[in-house]
Design a protein with these regions (language model features):
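Charged, compositionally biased N-terminal leader segments and the immediate start
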Residues: 1-24
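Core structural elements
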Residues: 21-26, 73-77, 84-85, 187, ...
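Conserved polymerase palm-domain catalytic core
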Residues: 58-61, 65-80, 117-284, 289
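Short, solvent-exposed helix-loop connector elements
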Residues: 91, 122, 194-198, 326-340, ...
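A conserved non-catalytic segment of reverse transcriptases
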Residues: 188, 270-336, 347-349
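Short secondary-structure subsegments characteristic of cysteine-rich extracellular domains
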Residues: 358-381
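Extended C-terminal regions of large enzymes
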Residues: 372, 379-426
């Protein structure tokens, strides 16, 4: 059927709901939910409780409700997550496991349909695509002298997705009343007429679909301004984080303005607001910088006297990490250091693994020295002998005997990977 869709732009899929309701689909959705783990929803039901009472009976009950059209989603539990250690928070919605399974089943059926329509520059929460690929795509564009950058910030994007417009986009490809009814119920469970809940299983797919026409416009801009083998426009989007990079040669001065204007027109159609205070056009050739996916990008003169992209963790990300670690040390001030290290190691490992693809050596050295200092301070307080713990514990002792995380190696490739040429846009 996907081949039909490719050749027929108006192709609509039908008979999908029966696949959503199949036990094999629900089983796979349950395994996906369990793999991601997460806290229980508003009903307090845990995976342990489900396993104890029987997974098959749990899934069979869901299937019966779906088939009889008696399924109704519960309200999601809300949890506030601090943004980069600051005062602002992001509200995370935590559905019940039951609702995660239903959303997962719906995603399993709908995702292949919409994946066939998504564009090369979109990376967020898509199969076989990673944030690192988006990071590299931007770095390669800078390496290709695309140094005029539209750094775009969308105001509360997930909270402002219009349900009516979103459902229209789904209906262009889905001709199944039961699927549409189920999707409407999931959206209405938020109690609002707009917004997709951050934390919902199907939300990333829907948020990508909502911005797909923006992606399509940008891919068309890449193609229409292409002069083989060169492109003069490039972009990358990961969910609501988006940057557009344009060749800064004086003859292309008009291009940045034209792309920005078209971008505003497409976003206005979707009723997506641009945060004007945080959005800007940056000229990397004049020393400007911008952030994308936690990295701060700029252009520097390399040892070979050639300009190259430089991207490292932005200061807010480092500050947020240290604040999180500091709180763990504070909460465990009287506990053995081994227990503290057991808590901070996974945090360090995850943070370092993400940022190891960039020019992060200076930042990593700072973090490593800071962590060493905190661990030695903890050892001194534990022994109540001022100064003893500091020199007694060499780096070999900290990393060898105590097992403090120590893999701060960079994993950046020797050369920037080739970005696949954009597909033609019809």
């Amino acid at each position: 059927m996907l081949s039909n869709w490719k050749t027929e732009p108006v192709w609509r899929f039908w008979g999908l709901y029966v696949h959503v309701c199949k036990m094999e689909t629900l089983r796979e959705a349950y395994l996906m939910a369990k793999k991601n783990d997460g806290a229980p929803g508003i009903d307090g039901v845990t995976f342990e409780a489900i396993e104890e009472s029987g997974v098959e009976s749990f899934l069979q009950q869901i299937r019966d409700e779906l088939v009889s059209n008696t399924y109704r989603p519960m309200r999601a539990r809300k949890k506030e997550i601090p943004k980069d250690g600051g005062t602002k928070v992001r509200v995370l919605s935590i559905p019940s496991i039951r609702d995660r399974v239903v959303q997962g089943a719906l995603k399993l059926i709908l995702e292949p349909i919409f994946e066939a329509d998504f564009q090369p520059g979109s990376y967020g929460y898509r199969p076989k695509r990673t944030a690192h690929e988006a990071v590299y795509r931007v770095a390669q564009a800078i390496d290709q002298r695309k140094t005029s950058v539209i750094d775009l910030d969308l105001r509360a994007y997930f909270d402002n997705v219009q349900h009516s417009l979103l459902l229209e986009k789904v209906a262009r490809r889905v001709q199944d009343d039961d699927v549409m009814r189920l999707l409407k119920m999931i959206l209405k469970a938020t109690g609002k007429k707009k917004g997709v809940p951050q934390g919902g299983v199907v939300s990333p797919l829907l948020s990508n679909l909502y911005l797909n026409e923006v992606d399509r416009m940008l891919e068309k801009a890449i193609q229409t301004t292409r002069r083989e083998p060169y492109t003069h426009v490039q972009y990358a989007r990961f969910a609501d984080d988006m940057v557009i990079l344009i060749d800064s040669h004086p003859r292309h001065d008009w291009l940045a303005r034209a792309v920005e204007q078209r971008l505003r027109e497409e976003l206005a159609k979707l009723k997506v607001e641009i945060n004007e205070e945080k959005s800007k056009i940056v000229d990397l050739a004049k020393g400007g910088s911008f952030t994308f996916l936690g990295f701060e990008y700029r252009r520097i003169l390399g040892r070979n006297k050639k300009w190259r992209p430089h991207y490292a963790p932005k200061l807010k990300k480092r500050t947020a990490l240290l604040a999180k670690l500091k709180e763990i040390f504070r909460q465990n001030v009287s506990q053995p250091v081994e227990g503290v290290i057991e808590q901070i190691n996974p945090i360090l490992r995850g943070w370092v693994n993400y940022f190891a693809v960039g020019d992060s050596s200076e930042c990593f050295s700072f973090v490593r020295d800071w962590v060493e200092k905190k661990v030695r301070g903890h050892l001194m307080r534990a022994r109540e002998r001022s100064g003893l713990g500091w020199k007694r514990w060499s780096r070999q002792g900290l990393y060898g005997k105590l097992g403090l995380y120590n893999d701060y190696r960079l994993r950046r490739p020797w050369s920037l990977p080739k970005v696949q040429p954009a597909a033609s846009v019809t």
